[in-house]
Amino acid sequence: MSLQAPKGTKDLLPTESYKWQYLENKFRNIAADFGCREIRTPVFEYTELFQRGVGETTDVVQKEMYTFEDKAGRSITLKPEGTSPAVRAFVEGRLFNETQPTKMYYFTPVMRYENVQKGRLRQHHQFGIEIFGAKDASVDAEVISIPVGIYKELGVEGVELNINSIGCPKCRKTYNEALKKYLSKNYDKLCSTCKTRFDKNPLRILDCKVDTCKEIVKDAPIILDYICGECKEHFESLKNYLDVLNINYKIDPFIVRGLDYYSKTVFEFITDDITICAGGRYDYLIEEIGGPSMPAVGFGMGMERLLLTLQEKAIEIPEEAYVDLYLGNMGDKAKLEVLKLAKELRDRHIKCEIDHMGKSVKAQMKYANRIGAKYSMVLGEEELNTGKATIKKMEDGQQIEVDIKDMDTLIKVFK
């Protein structure tokens, strides 16, 4: 029996990697437009980071984390999300001592033990942005505008932005009391997980995926009716900023997000009933992880779900030729010259492929076509004697005679 990749994982083969590279370059450029710099964090962290940050009562911590003990008996978890590690790095690196705000972006694999289905894998990849140190709602609007810009640049239409405010610990306490009073009428119908959440963190019940619980919370009190004056003012400011930026949105009072660290603003981008990007404000997470009291806001965007969306909307990602010139050869002497010529061209960043398998010229040209080479050139005894060779443009068959010793003229063909 041949070995296979674990369930819920997927290999990224060379025939697909160009799509990822295209998107990653797009994201990097857009992140740079907003003054964000890249951060890279370990693929695993101490489990306590996610217990404290994400929350003990969340589905992520209770059901979905890949957790194990290392050889020293320490509890380690493969990271299930990108924000907590970024915050941990921000605190550990004492970046809070620098002039704020601090703006970061990242690409990271995240691992969750979930039911494998369309657009949902056990290892998927996130593009994320985190901004630390700014509390005004204008930065929330700026963060939201980044995915808006990404979808616009990629030509993705039909994406809906939903926003909500889940308040702060002060006003959430009042809401939790009202929510518990409402839920108590149907306590016996709650799933076992939500029964444990009832006293510890009733807000999490709104995020339950079990059908009976989803039905119960349909008529639950709306958190926007309970937020304090400060949180209400922040939410009104956010809406005003989004209006100024001409960003359309809907208010969804039942968005709470599946992670405990969120406060005030939460948002989701949805298309075809699938959430393809989500985020919000987390003004208390930095302090929870051991740093000073400092506001923050960010989002995570699933790469696999974005690629699925592009595919379903028939949006093609352009594939650039990854070989400028295929250098064919006829005979051992020509092969030596081809090796030397390829080195000189590569030293000047011309992407070259050569034959290492002793193929016939016909087979070499067939291979050049398969790899999408822009040009081809074959060296044989005649070309070595005259110092002249013909470069063929693979797209239309156009031919150009060149002096193979005149490197400057040769390179101009590819520029």
Curated annotation (Swiss-Prot):
Reactions catalysed: tRNA(His) + L-histidine + ATP = L-histidyl-tRNA(His) + AMP + diphosphate + H(+)
Disulfide cross-links: none
Parts forming coiled coils: none
Name listed for the protein in its UniProt record: Histidine--tRNA ligase
Chief place where the protein resides: cytoplasm
UniProt cross-references to InterPro entries, sorted A to Z: aa-tRNA-synth_II, aa-tRNA-synth_II/BPL/LPL, Anticodon-bd, Anticodon-bd_dom_sf, His-tRNA-ligase, HisRS-like_core, HisRS/HisZ, HisRS_anticodon
Domain of life: Bacteria
Biological process terms in GO annotation: histidyl-tRNA aminoacylation
E.C. numbers: 6.1.1.21
Record note on quaternary structure: Homodimer.
Family the entry assigns: Belongs to the class-II aminoacyl-tRNA synthetase family.
Keyword Ribosomal protein assigned: no
Cellular localization per UniProt: Cytoplasm
Presence of keyword Metal-binding: no
HAMAP family xref list: His_tRNA_synth (MF_00127)
Species this chain originates from: Clostridium botulinum (strain Kyoto / Type A2)
A single GO cellular-component term on record: cytoplasm
